[in-house]
């Protein structure tokens, strides 16, 4: 782990640790110690698994994913069966799954609980406090978080089909990072200042389908907004002002070139012209 310098202690970093949002015990108030280290590299996949992944990436990039329209939520697609390949691992920028539309979940069975459990395991493994499903390559509207960032401490939240109802007028600018924009194997960690409302009201469902209504402030509000952005296909550099964006742009372009090298048949959105 690497702790930020003292002057940055109050900059609550979204996903600054290895794999998610992380806050450790602090002397008082909203002061948090933070680390930017990420997690383990994904296990090598078989040739068949790689072929399936390549096909799925092309389908997502071309908008051909097989999803059903949900009449209750306009053009938002829905899924009645959850499927994924284990073990899950972190999806890195600019993988098109981070920009793809995320389907509403209409099934509340053991598969949903198993998916959430696997996401929590990745989150804790990488010392995070929050994780959204598209960040592990599953394009559904699901997020998990625990503000304490430690298994057995704090409360675990599973939010299904979350909606942002309203946000307060007050905002705060803090440094953020993102597990999808880091690669410990090459010592790459992208961070930048992001302004967000410090209060939000949200509605969602839990893993049983029961309705959840929450008013979140400060740290939890920031966790929720960062993960909710992922469900909207919005990435944290989209929230940066132009000056801050220009600081991280070279590293974003580097990650794009690295991804294209390993996925030559997949088209991605590039920031090179911005």
Language-model regions, residue ranges each:
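Positively charged
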Residues: 2-274
């Amino acid at each position: 782990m690497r702790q930020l310098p003292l002057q940055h202690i109050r900059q609550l970093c979204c996903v600054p640790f290895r794999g998610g949002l992380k806050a450790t015990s602090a002397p008082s108030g909203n002061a948090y110690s933070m680390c930017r280290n990420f997690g383990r590299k994904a296990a090598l996949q078989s040739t068949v698994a790689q072929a399936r992944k390549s096909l799925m990436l092309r389908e997502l990039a071309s908008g051909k994913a097989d999803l059903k329209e949900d009449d209750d939520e306009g053009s938002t697609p829905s899924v009645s069966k959850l499927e994924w390949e284990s073990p899950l691992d972190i999806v890195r920028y600019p993988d098109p799954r981070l920009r793809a539309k995320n389907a509403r979940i209409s099934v509340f069975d053991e598969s949903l609980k198993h998916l959430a459990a696997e996401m929590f395991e990745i989150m804790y493994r990488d010392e995070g406090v929050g994780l959204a499903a598209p960040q592990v390559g599953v394009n559904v509207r699901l997020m998990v978080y625990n503000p304490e960032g430690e298994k057995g401490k704090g409360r675990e939240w599973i939010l299904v089909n979350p909606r942002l109802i309203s946000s307060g007028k007050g905002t705060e600018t803090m440094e953020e990072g993102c597990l999808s924009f880091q690669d410990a194997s090459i010592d790459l960690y992208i961070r930048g200042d992001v302004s967000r409302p410090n209060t939000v009201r949200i509605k969602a469902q839990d893993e049983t389908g029961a309705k959840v209504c929450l008013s979140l402030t400060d740290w939890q509000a920031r966790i929720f907004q960062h993960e909710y952005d992922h469900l909207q296909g919005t990435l944290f550099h989209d929230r940066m002002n132009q000056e801050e964006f220009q600081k991280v742009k070279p590293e974003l372009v580097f990650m794009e070139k690295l991804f294209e090298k390993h996925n030559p048949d997949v088209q991605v959105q590039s920031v090179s012209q911005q």
